[in-house]
Regions:
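Transmembrane alpha-helices that form the ion-translocation and gating core
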Residues: 99-145, 305-335
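Flexible hinge motifs at transmembrane-helix junctions and intramembrane kinks/re-entrant loops
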Residues: 24-40, 52, 57, 61, ...
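Juxtamembrane and boundary regions of transmembrane helices in multi-pass small-molecule transporters
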Residues: 115-122, 165-203, 321-329
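Intrinsically disordered, low-complexity non-transmembrane regions of multi-pass membrane transporters
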Residues: 1-11, 20, 181-219, 261-266
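Entry/N-cap segments of selected transmembrane alpha helices
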Residues: 84-114, 219-222, 275, 290-320
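Hydrophobic transmembrane alpha-helices of secondary-active transporters
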Residues: 17, 44-51, 64-92, 251-260, ...
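Structural signature of hydrophobic alpha-helical transmembrane segments
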Residues: 2-16, 62-75, 125-132, 240-252, ...
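Membrane-core helix-loop-helix motifs of multi-pass transport proteins
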Residues: 97, 125-189, 211
């Protein structure tokens, strides 16, 4: 028996799953401590339910997830509006070094993913489902790139990427605190802690103040950036390279933000845009999670565990020996 849900029913189920996740997160301390997103909590429960229904032959669910892409582009467009060059410049040399280190980590993660997948005799594209896409990008990027990898022939790529992102979130939460604490105590770094100059951040926070009357304007700015983004995406596609659909919108949003910042001719309503982006992300993740097909992981269970274990070891070694040492071996570097 196949249970088909249209786009309205699909997003309604996603909202119910989101509400369930919020309910459980506020009542189960470990979920709050590890910062597990509410859509992931509720979505995993629902995905397990649909998996049991499928495996037992009771029912198979079919969703119309067309709104998932709309919510995804809304969210990543809101992220594009975060690109404020004034704030980036305030980071100075240390920010540039950190960005270079992150790029190095991304390269290492993908090399490891491809290398391990070849050793395990599986497709390198499957390995990439556990590389920088979920480990650096998180659930949002995992949900965006999953369909792209599926277009390249990786069956169940969305499920693989989402599973890896969930593991990465939990592993990072478990590992981050103890590693930072060990470095601080072992190197006696508390004495190197320097109070930060938060003047620019305070100024930036003022731009994030919310006004109810400005939410329509924020929606319009997001839609304009998305519209311009489609043109940019078409131009990028002419290069022959494959980009996620949201890249053009992110670029357009970044340009709009900085033109507004430097010209002073118009205001970007960042607080309202952040709120709309947050709602869009929750709906996007909700739809992405309820459409997971966990049974597709069965044949790749052992390789997936091996790949994720390798990524965990890499992350520990890179943060402990590379990032800490290059970023100055002080309190800020440890944190």
């Amino acid at each position: 028996m196949t249970i088909q849900l249209d786009m309205y029913q699909t997003i309604a189920v996603a909202v119910v799953v989101l509400m369930l996740g919020n309910f459980l997160k506020h009542r189960i301390a470990i979920l709050e401590r590890f910062c597990i997103p509410a859509p992931v909590i509720g979505g995993v429960i629902f995905a397990i339910f649909t998996c049991v229904c499928y495996v037992t032959g009771f029912a198979e669910f079919s969703f119309d997830d067309i709104l998932k892409e709309v919510c995804m582009v809304f969210f990543f467009t809101s992220v594009g509006f975060q690109a404020n060059l004034k704030v980036l410049k305030s980071g100075g040399k240390s920010l540039i070094i950190f960005l270079i280190l992150v790029i190095m980590l991304i390269i290492c993660q993908n090399f490891l993913a491809v290398g391990l997948s070849k050793a395990l005799q599986i497709s390198p594209l499957v390995g990439l489902c556990t590389g920088s896409i979920p480990m650096i990008g998180g659930h949002g990027t995992a949900g965006a790139f999953g369909p792209v990898l599926e277009d390249f022939g990786v069956k169940g790529a969305s499920t693989l990427c989402t599973a890896a992102a969930t593991f990465g979130l939990i592993a990072g939460s478990i590992m981050g605190g103890p590693v930072g604490k060990r470095l601080i105590e072992k190197k006696n770094l508390l004495k190197t802690a320097i109070p930060e100059d938060n003047s620019l951040l305070i100024e930036e926070e003022k731009k994030h103040e919310r006004h109810t009357s400005m939410y329509p304007a924020a929606v319009f700015q997001l839609i304009i950036a998305m519209g311009i983004g489609t043109i940019i995406s078409k131009l990028l596609s002419m290069t022959g390279m494959t980009f996620p659909i949201y890249i053009g919108a992110m670029i357009a949003a970044a340009f709009m933000r900085n033109i507004g910042e430097y010209s002073g001719q118009f205001t970007i309503y960042m607080g309202e845009i952040n709120d709309i982006g947050g709602i869009s992300l929750s709906l996007f993740l909700g739809i992405a999670m309820i459409t997971l097909k966990l049974w597709q992981l069965a044949d790749l269970a052992l390789p997936l565990i091996t790949l994720l274990a390798g990524q965990t070891i890499l992350m520990f070694l890179f943060t402990y020996f590379v990032i800490f040492n290059i970023m100055g071996r002080d309190y800020d570097a440890a944190v």
